[in-house]
């Protein structure tokens, strides 16, 4: 039987569940409580996996030592990571079997971990990115160290922000959204932890490998063969967990956000496996050779690269947008039909668009034309999604004015519409002749990465943190305002600097004098770029400062005491009694 208070909360819906508060967990006690919440068999399985992983790390270290290969360092990283995680697991390993009552509530501990680690990766990745920006303006900032060269720092930046920040945020929010929209608890408690911890091990291997010079030299797919195999294991577990949870849903309808999340998970698995098909030079070394070569290798890489943008940086974050924006605005999606049309349009058209990255190359022209055509058609489903998000705010624009969290999401939708228009425009061959290989492309990418991906992620995290930790609100709404304006200013400075530098570059490279020779040398174009590169670094610095402000605000929200101690004895409503959110 529900208590009188529980019944009242049920009638008012999930909107008020974030008011149910509890004292903030101390770090040690919190970890112990999380581990003791696992069943004995789940703890045992976790220990078996970690011990096996430690032995794999030891074997990698030994093999690398014999060959004097960088795999030795990665072996020690895997070993230390496994031993450290084992020590954490031992904190609550001997706890008794948890009560079956835990199954009546949603399982949010993995989402909490994912949100926190996403913000850590955000600061790390953005710091490296801003370092790279200053490095391009002042090349001596390498300090004569090989690991600090552009070729090693740049993939560390992209992996840190795309896969570390973006990937952890997607995994954490997908667990949160899937449970609420399905009215079903995660299928088990071991899999989400395996996914999150295993995924972050992959990110650590990737970034540390780049700094040591371990790379396949494929953009967004730089990690070597053993890291790729590990990610396949982790990602298949993620896919199976998502499908198993959806299969046991109590809500008959699958909400559209889950469509986008599932497309993100499924297609990224396919892309990763195909593009990373390779033969190791030795199982005791890091080096491998792709199964593809020549123009086929280039086409496979950009089929992967552009669809990583499509399904990792677009579909997944549209799932985030379609849940958190209407929840925060307290408005239904403007048109559910538009969201479905946009989903199928993006899913079908994006798969064919990758070849526009290879205009004016050895790729057959008909393949280039095919990519250009589908890229232009992509504008329709992309703008459907952007318009649907903005029209959802009809009747709630006063909230956008007053609520910086909602403003993050609104501005993200605006940048999504702008960057997709720009992408379709730049895919046209005649336009691409000017933009190809210039900073215009960098500006376009960061309009999407900073303006769309980062802003929707920050907005969603600000929305979900009080709900996950049962706090009444974020620690400081004023700091959310500060973060918003720092992020927006940083994005605009960065993007406009790159648009200007890119167009100037393209024009200088194609300017001829009367004798038919180039009017400007390459060095002339580099000198002309310097003020824009400084502006880019300043814009990136503002964005980084905003992320640090966000980390502080989120941490203080987690640590802050209950604002409503009278409700501290309340417990969450059973999942099977909650309306789908």
Label every model-predicted segment:
Residues 32-38, 100-113:
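Cytosolic juxtamembrane amphipathic/interface segments immediately preceding
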Residues 1-58, 62:
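Intrinsically disordered, low-structural-confidence terminal and linker regions
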Residues 291-300, 435, 440-442:
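Active-site-proximal inter-transmembrane loops
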Residues 42-66, 71-96, 112-140, 147-214, ...:
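Hydrophobic cores of alpha-helical transmembrane segments in multi-pass integral membrane proteins
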């Amino acid at each position: 039987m529900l208590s009188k208070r529980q019944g009242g909360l049920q009638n008012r819906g999930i909107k008020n569940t974030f008011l149910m508060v509890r004292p903030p967990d101390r770090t040690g006690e919190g970890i112990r409580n999380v581990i003791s919440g696992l069943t004995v068999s789940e703890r045992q399985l976790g220990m078996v996996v970690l011990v096996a992983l430690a032995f794999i790390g030891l074997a990698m270290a030994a093999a690398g030592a014999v060959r004097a290969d960088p795999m030795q360092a990665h072996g020690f990283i895997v070993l230390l990571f496994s031993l450290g995680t084992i020590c954490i697991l031992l904190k609550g390993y001997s706890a008794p079997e948890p009560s079956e009552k835990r199954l009546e509530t949603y399982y949010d501990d993995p989402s909490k971990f994912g949100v926190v680690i996403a913000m850590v990766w955000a600061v790390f990745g953005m710091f490296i990115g801003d370092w790279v920006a200053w490095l391009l303006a002042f090349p001596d900032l390498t300090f004569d160290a090989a690991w600090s060269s552009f070729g090693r720092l740049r993939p560390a930046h992209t992996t840190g922000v795309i896969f570390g920040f973006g990937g952890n945020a997607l995994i954490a929010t997908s667990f949160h959204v899937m449970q609420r929209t399905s009215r079903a608890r995660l299928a088990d408690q071991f899999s989400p932890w395996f996914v999150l911890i295993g995924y972050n091990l992959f990110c650590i291997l990737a970034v540390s490998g780049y700094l040591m010079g371990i790379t396949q030299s494929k953009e967004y797919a730089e990690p070597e063969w053993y890291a790729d195999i590990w990610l396949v294991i982790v990602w298949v577990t993620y896919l199976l967990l998502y499908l198993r949870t959806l299969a046991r849903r109590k809500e008959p309808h699958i909400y559209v956000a889950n469509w986008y999340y599932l497309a993100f998970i499924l297609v990224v698995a396919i892309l990763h496996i195909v593009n990373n098909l390779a033969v190791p030079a030795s199982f005791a070394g890091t080096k491998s050779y792709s199964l593809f070569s020549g123009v086929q290798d280039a086409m496979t890489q950009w089929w992967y690269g552009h669809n990583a943008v499509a399904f990792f940086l677009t579909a997944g974050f549209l799932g985030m947008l379609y849940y958190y924006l209407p929840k925060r605005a307290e408005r239904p999606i403007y048109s559910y039909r538009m969201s479905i049309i946009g989903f199928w349009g993006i899913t079908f058209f994006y798969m064919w668009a990758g070849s526009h990255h290879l205009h004016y190359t050895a790729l057959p022209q008909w393949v280039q034309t095919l990519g250009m055509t589908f890229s232009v058609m992509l504008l329709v489903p992309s703008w459907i999604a952007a318009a649907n998000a903005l029209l959802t705010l009809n009747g709630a624009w006063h909230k956008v004015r007053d609520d910086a969290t909602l403003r993050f999401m609104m501005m993200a939708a605006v940048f999504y519409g702008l960057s997709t228009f720009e992408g379709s425009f730049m895919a046209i061959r005649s336009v691409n002749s000017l933009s190809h290989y210039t900073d215009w492309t960098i500006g376009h990418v960061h309009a999407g990465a900073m303006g769309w991906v980062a802003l929707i992620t920050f907005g969603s995290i600000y929305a979900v943190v009080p709900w996950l930790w049962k706090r009444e609100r974020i620690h400081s709404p004023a700091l959310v305002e500060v973060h918003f304006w720092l992020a927006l200013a940083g994005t605009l400075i960065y993007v406009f600097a790159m648009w200007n530098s890119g167009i100037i570059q393209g024009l200088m490279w194609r300017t001829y004098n009367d004798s038919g020779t180039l009017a400007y040398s390459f060095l002339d174009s580099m000198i002309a770029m310097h003020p824009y590169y400084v502006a880019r670094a300043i814009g990136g610095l503002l964005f980084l400062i905003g992320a640090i402000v966000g980390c502080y605000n989120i941490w203080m929200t987690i640590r802050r005491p209950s604002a409503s101690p009278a409700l501290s004895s309340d417990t969450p409503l059973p999942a099977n009694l909650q309306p789908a959110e």
